[in-house]
C-alpha cells in the first residue's frame, strides 16, 4: 500500500495549484498502524513535489493503544508535530459499546505519556449522545479532558450510519437512542465548559486553546485546495470534487496498472456557492458577505441578506464586520440554517 501512496503522489503532483503545503494529515482510519519511519518516508515523498512550510502542521491520527513508549519515542524523531487521539470516552462501558480496544485509564495514560515525550499539540475526540451516557458521565469525561491540559477538542454526536454495529443494534431494539433534549444538553454543557476552561469554539464540532486552531480542518472551511491520497481519500481544487476508490485491493490494482482510481464531480456556480455556505457558517469567522458579493454577484449577496434577516431578528445569527456568524442558539440548529441559505436551481 505504501508504494501505491508514493505512486499516487507522483501521479498527482500537479493537482494542487501551489508549490508549498502548510498542513499534512495522516487520517482516514488508523494510520498509526504504520511505523514512524514509514510515516516519515511519506512526508519526505511529499517534499519531493512541494515545499513543506517550516511551520507546517503535520498531524497523525492514532488510537490510544497504538501510542506505546517505543512508538512515541520513534515518532518524536519524525516531522509529526501534532497528535489527534481517538479517545471517544473515558468510561469503559461506553468504549465497549463503541467497540474500542482501549480502556478509559489507558486513554488517559496515553495522553500523559505523549506529553512526557514532548508532544505539545494534542487533540482528543469525544463522543456525546451515546446510549447510556448520562449528563453526570459526560461531565466526568470532559473534566478529565480539561485535567489533561490538551490543546484541542473535537466532539461529535454519535451517528447511526447504515450497516454499522450501532445501527444494527438499534434496529434490533438492543439500543435506545438518546433523547434529543439530552443530546442538546450535553452539547450545550460542552460549549459552556470548554469556554470556561480556556477553549475557543471556532467550528461547530471543534474547540481550541489560543494558537492551536487546526490548520488542516481550517483549510476545508476556508475553501482552500487539498489533495487526498489513498483509498476513499477526497480532493478538492475549487473546481471539482474528487474521491478515490474505497476498496483497498481495487485501489492498489488501479494505481499499479495505471487505471482510473477516482471519480470526479464538476462544480457549477451554485455548487460552489452552497459549498461556501456549508463551510463558512459552521465557523466563528462566519460567512463573509463581501466575499459572496465579489465571487457570486449582487443577486446571491441579496439572497444571503434576505435569508439572514429573520435569523438576526431571532438571535440565531449576528452580523459583525459584514460577516454572518451563528450565535450559540444558531449552532444548535445550524443544519436547518445552512440548508435554508442554500440556493437551489429551479428546473
Labelled PLM ranges:
Residues 329-347:
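Short, amphipathic alpha-helical interaction segments positioned at domain boundaries
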Residues 323-327:
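Minor-groove-contacting beta-hairpin "wing" of winged helix-turn-helix DNA-binding domains
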Residues 1-14, 19-298, 346:
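C-terminal scaffold of the Radical SAM
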Residues 298-312:
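Short amphipathic alpha-helical interaction segments
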Residues 312-322:
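A short, conserved structural fragment
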Residues 222, 313, 328:
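Short, ordered coil/turn segments that flank beta-strands lining enzyme active or ligand-binding pockets
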Amino acid at each position: 500500500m505504501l508504494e501505491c501512496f508514493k505512486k499516487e503522489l507522483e501521479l498527482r503532483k500537479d493537482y494542487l495549484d501551489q508549490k508549498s503545503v502548510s498542513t499534512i494529515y495522516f487520517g482516514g482510519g488508523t494510520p498509526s498502524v504504520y511505523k514512524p519511519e514509514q510515516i516519515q518516508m511519506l512526508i519526505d515523498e511529499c517534499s519531493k513535489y512541494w515545499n513543506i512550510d517550516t511551520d507546517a502542521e503535520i498531524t497523525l491520527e492514532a488510537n490510544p493503544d497504538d501510542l506505546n513508549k517505543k512508538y512515541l519515542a520513534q515518532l518524536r524523531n519524525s516531522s509529526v508535530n501534532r497528535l489527534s487521539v481517538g479517545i471517544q470516552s473515558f468510561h469503559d462501558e461506553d468504549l465497549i459499546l463503541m467497540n474500542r480496544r482501549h480502556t478509559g485509564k489507558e486513554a488517559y495514560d496515553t495522553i500523559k505519556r505523549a506529553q512526557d515525550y514532548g508532544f505539545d499539540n494534542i487533540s482528543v475526540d469525544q463522543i456525546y449522545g451515546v446510549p447510556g451516557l448520562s449528563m453526570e458521565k459526560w461531565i466526568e469525561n470532559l473534566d478529565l479532558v480539561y485535567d489533561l491540559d490538551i490543546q484541542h477538542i473535537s466532539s461529535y454526536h454519535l451517528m447511526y450510519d447504515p450497516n454499522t454495529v450501532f445501527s444494527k443494534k438499534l434496529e434490533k431494539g438492543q439500543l435506545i437512542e438518546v433523547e434529543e433534549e439530552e443530546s442538546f444538553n450535553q452539547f450545550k454543557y460542552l460549549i459552556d465548559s470548554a469556554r470556561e476552561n480556556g477553549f475557543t469554539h471556532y467550528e461547530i464540532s471543534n474547540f481550541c486553546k489560543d494558537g492551536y486552531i487546526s490548520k488542516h480542518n481550517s483549510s476545508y472551511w476556508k475553501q482552500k485546495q487539498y489533495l487526498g491520497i489513498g483509498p476513499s481519500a477526497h480532493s478538492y481544487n475549487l473546481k471539482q470534487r474528487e474521491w478515490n476508490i474505497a476498496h483497498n485491493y481495487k485501489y492498489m490494482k488501479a494505481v499499479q496498472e495505471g487505471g482510473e482510481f477516482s471519480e470526479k464531480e464538476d462544480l457549477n456556480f451554485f455548487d460552489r456557492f452552497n459549498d461556501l455556505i456549508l463551510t463558512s457558517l459552521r465557523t466563528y469567522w462566519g460567512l463573509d458577505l463581501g466575499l459572496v458579493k465579489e465571487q457570486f454577484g449582487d443577486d446571491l449577496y441579496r439572497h444571503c441578506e434576505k435569508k439572514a434577516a429573520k435569523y438576526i431578528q431571532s438571535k440565531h445569527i449576528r452580523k459583525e464586520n459584514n460577516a454572518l456568524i451563528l450565535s450559540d442558539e444558531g449552532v444548535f440548529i445550524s443544519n436547518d440554517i445552512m440548508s435554508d441559505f442554500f440556493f437551489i436551481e429551479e428546473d
